[in-house]
Amino acid sequence: MNFVEARNLPGHVGIIMDGNGRWAQLRGEPRVAGHREGALAVRRTVRAARRLGLRALTLYAFSEQNWARPEEEVDALMQLLREFLLSEKDEILDNGIRLNAVGNLGRLPALVRAVLDPLRYESEQNHQMTLTLALSYGGREEIVNAARELAKAVAAGRIRPEDVTAEALRAQIPSLSVGDPDLVIRTGGERRISNFLLYGLAYAELYFADVLWPDFAEKDLFGAIASFQARERRFGLVGSQSGNTCAPDAAAPVDSAPADASAPIARIAV
């Protein structure tokens, strides 16, 4: 039996939400039907993350390379994104969630920005959890942009070449404003990173799930976090040096969630 413990939670979880198209194809439906079901999985996952007490959740919603998909699919995705933001606005604001977005946001259509930008502003003082949507996003592109900003600063004389450090570069990377990811989950059965949070992934734990994203449920998130908590994170050291294990202690198991489903979980069996 595995357990999730509140005291050993990853601070920042990233999810590569893969499998919407295959989910639809398996049912003989258009790909957009899978994306629509995927939006419901986002809602479930955000609720579960908040219930667990996660500090930050980053969802890979649309990559820079996804613009090359058929125009009809891209248009449907943008419309669905707008609908999702509108439908989730009250839940975000009422539950202390700060909405963030990273990526080449200038490429997003006006119909999305008209909803996304005000909601980011309205929620910026919320502190229960930060929900980051990676939109028109690429990890390599993010690193290049960060390096370019430092190069400009050196050229302008604002900093010296020796001031260009790993931390200086990291400070220019928007996706890491909530910290490096501790755990990255990929659904859909593939075993790759797909240009996601590349700079911050140095010591992240990776979890690959076969479940397609539209079927991703609370139990799947809990299972991924239970796996994370059972690992020893060494950060390049040997185990005796790090003293950093995520494994839970041997307390009595809890077989069900608290009666108040919105309350943070202390310990739950999965």
For each of these PLM feature ranges, what is it?
Residues 1-270:
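Flexible, compositionally biased loop and terminal segments
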